[in-house]
């Protein structure tokens, strides 16, 4: 369209002295315009992501014969989101209400008008044959340089928009478009400029308000979560333009934020998920096992002491009884007197019923002594029965004890 217009202007009669010079100048301008527009067409051509939202306006000339200085070219207004939505759902008019709500902030931003040197130039005036060819060539060179810089800037914005529009949820394309609001983790970074210079002013304000609301909710939930000793860092979580989607930013940070907190309160450093305050699990298990072992040792000691005390007392009593018997036997043996020992016949006849031993055993075990001074049988029996009334009878031998010992040894 504009090439035909340029060719039509070049075919118009020019009232310059030197018609051939003016014709060659118009041809040179048309060729330069084609050379400048080809890179922009190549950048927009291969990718179907970038399509023009509206009908392209009439291109502005590189220079004007009436105003003199070159005018700025308008940058093409493309939107990657519109292309994705059209490819996934068909025409733009067939989008769901959910997608239309997601596009609403972007559309509002677009209506505010871009900043940073991307504003539309004023309407160019018609050219008038009042300048010379020298001024035209200088203005054409300056306009070409500025147009190249604008094309580079637009191409950089295009790559940034393509990178920011990439879906990070699994690396697969989603049928529903999503706008990622990259937000800072601190208050001092809330007013930083976004990737598109001057294009997201209202978005920055909404992100800041969302962060204030999120931090206020975090302050109320932190008091309730102290009982479980598990805190989560929600300061770095920024909500997207959709209220049901959130993009966590800075959740994995383990260092406390050095930025001043709200109301002058210090924010506790974030903790790792699953970490509990106090003793670890293996420490609790070790302490429990140690206590159980100590209690078992005490119970075992008490049981053994109670069980062994009666048996030890009984053993001690029996040992004491044996010692007493040995002492008595030794004392009785010291009073041994051979003159008063009865004969073997008397011993056998006196103790035959109690010892139940044969005549040979008694004769072999008990030595035969002289039967000179023997007492009567009744007196001997009284001596055997142990009825020693006075100390005078201590010179008698305890015949029962001696005969019993010899009986045990021999029989």
Swiss-Prot record:
Gene that specifies this protein: Ajap1
Topological domains annotated Cytoplasmic: 305-411
Protein name in UniProt: Adherens junction-associated protein 1
MF terms (GO), sorted A to Z: beta-catenin binding; protein domain specific binding; protein-containing complex binding
Compartments (UniProt record): Basolateral cell membrane; Apical cell membrane; Cell junction, Adherens junction
Ranges of biased composition (kind: Low complexity): 62-76, 121-145, 247-264
Targeting signals, as annotated region: 304-411
InterPro entries, sorted: AJAP1 (IPR039239), AJAP1_PANP_C (IPR029198)
Domain of life where this protein originates: Eukaryota
Keywords (A to Z) from UniProt: Cell adhesion, Cell junction, Cell membrane, Membrane, Signal, Transmembrane, Transmembrane helix
Gene Ontology CC: adherens junction; apical plasma membrane; basolateral plasma membrane; cell surface; cell-cell contact zone; cytoplasmic side of plasma membrane; plasma membrane
Disordered: annotated segments: 62-156, 242-270
Protein source organism: Rattus norvegicus (Rat)
């Amino acid at each position: 369209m504009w090439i035909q217009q340029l060719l039509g202007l070049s075919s118009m009669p020019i009232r310059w002295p030197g018609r051939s010079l003016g014709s060659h100048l118009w041809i040179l301008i048309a060729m330069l315009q084609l050379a400048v527009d080809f890179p922009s067409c190549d950048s927009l051509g291969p990718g179907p992501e970038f399509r023009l939202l509206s009908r392209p306006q009439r291109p502005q000339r590189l220079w004007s014969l009436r105003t003199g200085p070159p005018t700025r070219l308008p940058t093409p207004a493309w939107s990657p989101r519109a292309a994705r939505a059209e490819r996934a759902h068909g025409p733009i008019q067939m989008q769901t209400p959910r997608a239309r709500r997601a596009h609403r902030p972007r559309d509002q931003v677009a209506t505010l008008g871009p900043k940073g040197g991307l504003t539309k130039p004023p309407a160019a005036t018609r050219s008038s044959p009042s300048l010379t060819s020298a001024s035209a060539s200088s203005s054409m060179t300056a306009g070409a340089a500025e147009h190249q810089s604008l094309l580079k800037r637009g191409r950089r914005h295009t790559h940034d928009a393509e990178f920011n529009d990439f879906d990070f949820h699994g690396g697969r394309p989603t049928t529903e478009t999503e706008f990622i609001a990259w937000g800072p983790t601190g208050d001092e970074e809330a007013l930083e400029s976004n990737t598109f210079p001057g294009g997201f002013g209202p978005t920055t304000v909404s992100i800041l308000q969302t962060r204030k609301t999120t931090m206020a909710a975090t302050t109320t939930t932190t008091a309730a979560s102290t009982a479980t000793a598990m805190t989560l860092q929600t300061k770095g979580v920024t909500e997207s333009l959709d209220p049901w989607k959130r993009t966590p930013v800075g959740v994995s940070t383990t260092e406390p934020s050095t930025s001043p907190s709200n109301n002058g309160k210090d924010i506790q450093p974030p903790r790792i998920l699953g970490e509990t305050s106090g003793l670890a699990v293996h420490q609790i298990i070790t302490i429990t096992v140690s206590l159980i072992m100590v209690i078992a040792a005490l119970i075992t000691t008490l049981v053994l002491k109670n069980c062994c005390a009666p048996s030890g007392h009984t053993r001690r009593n029996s040992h004491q009884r044996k010692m007493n018997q040995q002492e008595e036997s030794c004392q009785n043996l010291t009073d041994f007197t051979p003159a008063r020992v009865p004969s073997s016949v008397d011993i056998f006849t006196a103790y035959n019923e109690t010892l139940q031993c044969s005549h040979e055993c008694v004769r072999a075990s008990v030595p035969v002594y002289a039967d000179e001074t023997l007492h009567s049988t009744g007196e001997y029996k009284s001596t055997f029965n142990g009825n020693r009334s006075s100390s005078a009878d201590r010179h008698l031998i305890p015949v029962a004890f001696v005969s019993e010992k010899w009986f045990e040894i021999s029989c």
